[in-house]
């Protein structure tokens, strides 16, 4: 994207991060360390992680830092952390989405905040991206709850089919990309089972984030150039090194010409 003078204009790329994924006495993630550097917090709603107290504390932390709150619903799979697909009917998917979004929204309301978007988690997210019927079901569920809530989903090499479906149902879409993952030529994430699927070098993670923010191409696993149109960038805060990477990404993006 360029301005009238022909200079490249960098649109603000929102940083989103999965949050509130502890449960009871079990702890996951460094939420307090990451929250100051992100724009959007995808807060677990109790089905893959999180519990009422964790949800309340995470919402409070997000509000303290002015971070936009999103619901992060999943299949009911605490043992598998929501990473296992489940054979759910459309009605069951709608019900589990409304249950989880409503739970987080209620906590937000009590604390003076609100749920501003929805991003499914894990296997539900992957199933939604792989199956147009499941994507339709998720979109219809979000629309039934609040058609003003955007759905966050994966940016691919061609977003047109998903965008058309979102337009048909009347739900805004926020396409996201990943700074720490390798991509296939189609714009899908390279399977974690394959070598090189996850970038561990912080410099490489920051470089990919900057390229995405500038609208530049990435190198796919087959060596081809991949263009992704994304509004938001998913980052992670699972350990000290990932927190450092998030901080560096924030500094790098803030330093870009806007």
Curated annotation (Swiss-Prot):
Keyword Nucleotide-binding in record: yes
InterPro entries according to UniProt: Glyco_hydro/deAcase_b/a-brl (IPR011330), LamB/YcsF/PxpA-like (IPR005501)
Organism domain of life: Bacteria
A Pfam family the protein falls into: LamB_YcsF
Gene3D superfamilies, per the entry: Glycoside hydrolase/deacetylase
GO MF annotations in UniProt: 5-oxoprolinase (ATP-hydrolyzing) activity; ATP binding
Catalytic reaction list: 5-oxo-L-proline + ATP + 2 H2O = L-glutamate + ADP + phosphate + H(+)
Record note on quaternary structure: Forms a complex composed of PxpA, PxpB and PxpC.
Entry function: Catalyzes the cleavage of 5-oxoproline to form L-glutamate coupled to the hydrolysis of ATP to ADP and inorganic phosphate.
Name of the protein in question: 5-oxoprolinase subunit A 2
